[in-house]
């Protein structure tokens, strides 16, 4: 999961020499401040200058908005403002639904931190509940600059800048997202992962008028330890219904993308039983894709909570629990070896608690473990090796 905004190479924060000089001469210039907003009652994350990744700073509470007070930020009605509002709302709705399903009376622990260069993350985590061993729901936003070569969509700006022989410099960007992994205790209740994010650039300051770039990414996928077709079909039907509201080609396209992405090469199997996944999506109207991402995020509760309610109290034995731990081991392997967000965060000094919040509390590795052919465990493994059409 890796808190989706410090996660992909296209989002690397580049050093800014001017900002570095400003910090040396005026330390306060690099600070994040929650200052008097333009809109009454709103506190905005204000970033004096985009800077390189720096040490995180704990915050007492989450700001009302992560956005700057400028023409495309707080109060502008921009896509970035609407997307940020959506992920903040969805975080609250999902945490409330999970607390109700857990029934332990426990509440999500909240953790808010920022970086002076324009990063703010609001993590919410529930551990050792009645139903959930570990559940994390994070929202985050980054305001910074990308190196000119760091992302493919900025190539248009380089062409514009080449007309006068001037090479475009670093590109200002904004990114925001919600990311979550939910690990239940019961082996018959599946793990769920979802992640929805938005990325956009501004024109480089040395190439005014260059085209802005933007894209959406994300997905929702299910990772059971036991194959219960009723549950898997319900989950996939919700994904298809959501996709079909926008384009009938979305579900088959994004289902295959999901099966391909969550592939554990060294095991020759998928992490789970799929769902939908997409990235760098910008080939449709921007408002349409914003609505699509909003619908996808909103479909998490109806796709998952009914399954949890059916399975959270299913009796199980020690062998079934051990199999769940083996499958959790596969989850850990994928996240630490292949997941782009996790590996990028580990390599670039990201906040470790946010990066590893996706991992389960417990997992298991048995030497040369092979389930008996025809067993319930084997059926799950076969479906992970050979992706199926569930609808």
Curated annotation (Swiss-Prot):
Main location, first listed in the record: plastid
Reaction(s) the record says it catalyses: coproporphyrinogen III + O2 + 2 H(+) = protoporphyrinogen IX + 2 CO2 + 2 H2O
Residues marked Important for dimerization (site): 266
Compositional bias (Low complexity): 14-30
Keywords on record: Chlorophyll biosynthesis, Chloroplast, Heme biosynthesis, Oxidoreductase, Plastid, Porphyrin biosynthesis, Transit peptide
Compartmental location: Plastid, Chloroplast
Organism domain of life: Eukaryota
Name under which the protein is recorded: Oxygen-dependent coproporphyrinogen-III oxidase, chloroplastic
Classification of source organism: Eukaryota, Viridiplantae, Streptophyta, Embryophyta, Tracheophyta
Gene label: CPX
């Amino acid at each position: 999961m890796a808190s989706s905004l410090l996660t992909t190479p296209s989002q690397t924060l580049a050093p800014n020499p001017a900002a570095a000089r400003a910090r040396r001469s005026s330390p306060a210039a690099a600070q994040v401040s929650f200052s008097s907003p333009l809109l009454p009652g709103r506190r905005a994350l204000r970033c004096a200058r985009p800077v390189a990744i720096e040490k995180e700073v704990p915050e007492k509470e989450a700001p009302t908005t992560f956005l700057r007070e400028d023409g495309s930020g707080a109060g502008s009605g921009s896509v970035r403002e609407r997307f940020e509002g959506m992920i903040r709302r969805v975080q609250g709705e999902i945490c409330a639904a999970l607390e109700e399903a857990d029934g332990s009376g426990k509440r999500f622990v909240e953790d808010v931190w920022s970086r002076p260069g324009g990063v703010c993350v609001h993590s919410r985590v529930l551990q050792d509940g009645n139903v959930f061993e570990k559940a994390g729901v994070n929202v985050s936003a980054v305001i910074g600059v990308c190196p000119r070569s760091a992302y493919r969509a900025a190539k248009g700006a380089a062409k514009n800048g080449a007309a006068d022989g001037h090479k475009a410099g670093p590109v200002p960007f904004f990114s925001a997202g919600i990311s979550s992994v939910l690990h239940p205790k019961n082996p018959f209740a599946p793990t769920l992962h979802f992640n929805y994010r938005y990325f956009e650039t501004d024109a480089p300051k040395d190439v005014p008028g260059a085209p802005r770039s933007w894209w959406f990414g994300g997905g929702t996928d299910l990772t059971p330890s036991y194959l219960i077709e009723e549950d898997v079909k319900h989950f996939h039907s919700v994904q298809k219904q959501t996709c079909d509201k926008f384009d009938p080609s979305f579900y088959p396209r994004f289902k295959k993308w999901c099966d391909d992405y969550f592939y554990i090469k060294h095991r020759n199997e998928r992490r789970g039983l799929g769902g939908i996944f997409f990235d760098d999506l910008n080939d449709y109207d921007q408002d349409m894709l914003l609505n699509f991402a909003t619908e996808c995020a909103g479909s998490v509760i109806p796709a998952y909570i009914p399954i949890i309610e059916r399975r959270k109290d299913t009796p199980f034995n020690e062998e079934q629990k051990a199999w769940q731990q083996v499958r959790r081991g596969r989850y850990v392997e994928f996240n630490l070896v292949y997941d782009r967000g996790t590996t990028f965060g580990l390599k670039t000094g990201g906040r470790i608690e946010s990066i590893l919040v996706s991992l389960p509390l417990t997992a298991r590795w048995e030497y040369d473990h092979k389930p008996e052919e025809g067993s319930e465990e084997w059926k799950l493994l076969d479906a992970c090796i050979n992706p199926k059409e569930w609808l």
